[in-house]
Design a protein with these regions (language model features):
Chain A
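Conserved NTP-handling cores and scaffolds of large molecular machines
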Residues: 101, 177, 218, 241, ...
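A short linear hydrophobic-aromatic micro-motif
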Residues: 116, 241-245, 272-276
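C-terminal coupling/interaction segments
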Residues: 255-306
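ABC transporter nucleotide-binding domains
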Residues: 2-195, 199-201
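ABC transporter nucleotide-binding domain
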Residues: 166-253, 257
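Short, flexible cytosolic linker that couples an ABC transmembrane/permease module to its adjacent nucleotide-binding
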Residues: 110, 212-216, 300
Length: 306, 256
């Protein structure tokens, strides 16, 4: 459980985070979304006690991060890339962290295994790819078997296989009852794993909602269907609440139903489908609309003041 | 995993592990005996009685290689703290030990004890080796002579304190080149510049600058016009305490 109470962070004249309050609950994945530079990393740094808030405070598991006797057991964090010494091996990096808490050596081997780094464990981190560096950061986050996991842009630099691995990992961590808080600037990626969303723009809270509500309100969730028999399928799918548009011949955008219903309907009537894709791009669009508004709003305010 | 807590002993284990798992530590520490013994032997081999170096203290003469050691342990001190900022490792370190100060104290303790041990071993090796070449000269001396052991041990203690001072500077400056710049500028070059000034009070103060105090500490026979061994050691300790205290205050306040 993470709680932010009116967090505010100012660097000189620049206010990066303003009066931010939210709660992240255990047992689900919570996405922390915002465009680049919206204050996500600063917020995470304040939660972890790396930066002191100008006002407000954050707690993890009921108290300030630094007040926990075993911080790594309370929160495991993937920080921005390169939070390590490039001259040290992956194994020694993790061992040094483990030693601060008396975490057994066997656990170091376990997280190396879990992140697929066992073979690279004794290589110096200098030679690691971006993806391997991310995996090592995730290994460090899991080292203390933490109740809460905080990951800053975990899919950055990962190959498609790695992205898939992260999705599964996040869901399984949440299923174990842990609090999982994942920042990202990609709505479509986040919507695949998260159930809850906290969206910020320019350091302010824009939305604290579920993915389901966000999708419904955004009007996203259209399904793209490519079929040689479009007219028939349109007739079969027509129902109250279902809207179908066909901008190009043979390609339908269906709103108001899901891929499962469309697929079954087509199969039942022997209609060939070339493509059946839930349209995540419109979700991305809704997210961009939401955050762009906040940026424009802020810009207008500044203009009015000047 | 029920007994997980951060304790001072565990932080010590972690910092000890960190120091020995990067190559630069091994390289730097290996250079200390190599350069000191090498310089000592070269001096011993080329020394002539009654020459220009006759009035140089015997310990200072044989340990002339400590000029290199000053730089080496200084760099090592800066790397220990500022290196974590340059690489970004500091974020991991401070997430594991969010109370922060135990990390600073532990780093200082680990670096001081390792420096002291390596330098003392080097000195106890260098002096007798150089003396085998100086046996028939006016610089002949043995470990049992008055002040010799005190100067050899004092030199090691002084260099350990210099390393801690550098570590404090590294933590304050948070940049390896910046830290090395401040170290050489303020500690090595500044006293030489100040000495040129025609004021006695400045001369008195310069005596207690780290490098000057270290020179004084390395004398078997205290020379007039330099600090006494006790005062020199105290001065070096105060430099270390002052920089480390400033580093601690800022470490607690600043964002990582």
């Amino acid at each position: 459980m993470i709680t932010a109470h009116q967090l505010t962070k100012r660097y000189g004249d620049r206010t990066v985070v303003t009066d931010l309050s939210f709660t992240v609950r255990p047992g689900t994945v919570t996405g922390f979304l915002g465009p680049n530079g919206s204050g996500k990393s600063t917020t995470l740094r304040m939660i972890l006690g790396l930066d002191a808030p100008t006002r407000g405070h954050a707690t993890v598991g009921g108290r300030a991060y630094a007040a926990h006797p075993a911080p790594l057991h309370e929160v495991g964090a993937l920080l921005e890339a390169g939070s390590l010494h490039p001259g040290r091996t992956a194994y020694h990096h993790l061992t040094a962290l483990a030693l601060t808490h008396g975490i057994p050596k066997s656990r170091v081997g376990h997280v190396l295994d879990l992140t697929g780094l066992t073979e690279a464990a004794h290589r110096r981190v200098k030679g690691f790819s971006l993806g391997m560096g991310q995996r090592l950061g995730i290994a460090a986050a899991l080292l203390g078997d933490p109740a809460t996991v905080v990951l800053d842009e975990p899919v950055n630099g990962l190959d498609p296989e790695g992205v898939l691995w992260i999705r599964t990992l996040l869901k399984s961590l949440a299923a174990e009852g842990r609090t999982v808080f994942v920042s990202s600037h990609l709505m479509s990626e986040t919507a695949l794993t998260a159930e809850h969303l906290i969206i910020i723009g320019r350091g302010r809270l824009l939305a604290d909602t579920t993915v389901e509500d966000f999708v419904r309100q955004s009007g996203a969730g259209t399904v793209k269907v490519v079929t040689p028999d479009a007219p028939t399928l349109v007739r079969l799918l027509s129902a109250p609440g279902v809207h179908i548009t066909a901008d190009t011949p043979g390609t339908l955008d269906v709103r108001g139903t899901d891929t499962e219903h469309i697929g079954r309907t087509a199969a039942a009537h022997g209609i060939t489908l070339f493509e059946l894709t839930p349209n995540a791009a419109s979700l991305e669009q809704a997210f961009m609309d939401l955050t762009r508004d906040s940026v424009e709003f802020a810009a207008t305010l500044e203009g009015a003041r000047a | 995993m029920t007994s997980l807590t951060v304790t001072p002993t565990r932080v010590l284990h972690a910092e000890w592990h960190k120091l020995w798992t990067i190559r630069s530590t091994w390289i730097n520490l290996a250079l200390v005996p190599v350069l000191t013994v090498g310089t000592g032997l070269a001096i011993g081999a080329s020394y002539e009685s009654g020459g220009g170096d006759s009035d140089v203290d015997v310990v200072l003469l044989t340990l002339l290689g400590m000029q290199f050691t000053q730089i080496i342990v200084g760099v090592l001190g800066v790397l220990t703290t500022a290196g974590e900022y340059s690489t970004g490792l500091i974020r991991s370190t401070m997430t594991a030990v969010p109370r922060r100060l135990p990390v600073l104290w532990t780093k200082a303790a680990v670096l001081a004890s390792i420096t002291f041990t390596v330098v003392l071993a080097t000195n106890l090796l260098t002096f007798p080796l150089a003396q085998t070449l100086l046996a028939d000269t006016d610089q002949a001396a043995s470990l049992g002579d008055p002040g010799i052991i005190r100067a050899l041990v004092g030199n090691a203690a002084g260099l350990a304190l210099l390393a801690v001072t550098a570590l404090g500077i590294g933590s304050l400056v948070r940049s390896v080149p910046g830290g090395i710049g401040v170290l050489t500028g303020a500690l090595l070059i500044l006293p030489e510049v100040l000495r040129m000034l025609p004021y006695n009070v400045v001369d008195d103060a310069v005596r207690y600058f780290p490098t000057k105090a270290l020179d004084a500490l390395t004398h078997a026979d205290p020379t007039p016009g330099t600090a006494t061994p006790g005062a020199a050691l105290l001065a070096l300790a105060l430099w270390a305490v002052a920089t480390l205290t400033a580093a601690a205050l800022l470490l607690k306040r600043r964002d990582v």
